[in-house]
Regions:
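Exposed, low-structure sequence patches enriched in small/polar residues
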Residues: 1-16, 31-249
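N-terminal extension/subdomain marker
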Residues: 23-28
Length: 249
């Protein structure tokens, strides 16, 4: 059983309103000099584990767990009354189940596979499966080692990509899709020669990022003299592929 509590606070202070008007595109809180945001997360996990080798039939260790997470985000908000500020609380919860299968003993083969699925709450449908392993073979008096690691993850964009309220940046993105990431990487090692060959590929679908949305400031002749700062969340609905390869001798 584990209990994890995270408390995070951010306070933004800016007294130079003239500079804010010049530098930022938006000043949602008017001349207010301070805006705050708070994040609280409480995660409770209960699990049961069967250790590798606890009897002659147990060739691998097995763990199963159940997790519940409560999250609260407090953001400064405005009202219909000019100058009035309130704290808007966004409450989220997520219930997930998971398991782990691992083999650490012996010399030939080792592996670890960890999976988790959100079955209810804000993150329902989110899942991740991660695995890594190594195979060790004797060949011509040398040890040849093959390492493999891979994962597939389908994850909800983080809260602050979905909702954010502050003095200069403000958005509500209720239509963001889950981010799908898959990766496969392998490494071949020859101990005697000190040779390593590594290759990997990763695919990202619905890549979500913070984009520069600044606008140009022009003089009376149309020349760009500067920019007013702004940012926005963007999501690329296509696929992004990353390939890597390395030979080390």
């Amino acid at each position: 059983h584990t209990l994890q509590v995270d408390l995070n606070n951010r306070k933004y202070i800016s007294y130079d309103d003239a500079q804010n008007q010049k530098y930022f595109e938006h000043n949602y809180l008017g001349t207010d000099s301070i805006d705050k945001t708070k994040r609280t997360s409480i995660k409770n996990t209960i699990g049961i584990a069967l250790q590798e080798g606890f009897n002659k039939w147990a060739k691998a260790g097995l763990t199963a767990f159940l997790s519940y997470e409560y999250r609260n985000f407090a953001l400064t908000d405005t009202t219909n009354i000019p100058g009035q500020r309130i704290i808007n609380n966004y409450k989220e919860s997520s219930l997930s189940i998971g398991g782990e299968l691992s083999k650490k003993q012996g010399k030939l083969l080792h592996y670890n596979i960890l999976g988790e699925l959100a079955i209810a709450g804000e993150d329902a449908g989110q899942f991740s499966v991660e695995g890594r392993g190594d195979l060790n073979l004797r060949l011509f008096g040398d040890t040849v080692r093959l390492d493999v690691n891979a994962f597939i993850k389908n994850q909800n964009p983080v809260f602050y990509f979905r909702h954010f309220q502050s003095k200069h940046y403000w958005w509500d993105n209720n239509d963001l899709s889950k981010i799908m990431r898959t990766r496969l990487e392998g490494k071949l090692s020859l101990n005697r020669w000190g040779t390593q060959l590594r290759a990997g590929v990763e695919n990202i679908k619905n890549y979500t990022y913070l984009a520069n949305a600044s606008i140009p400031v022009k003089d009376s002749e149309g020349n760009v003299t500067g920019f007013k700062n702004n940012a926005a969340v963007r999501q690329h609905s296509g696929n992004i592929q990353i390939f890597t390869a390395m030979l080390q001798q």
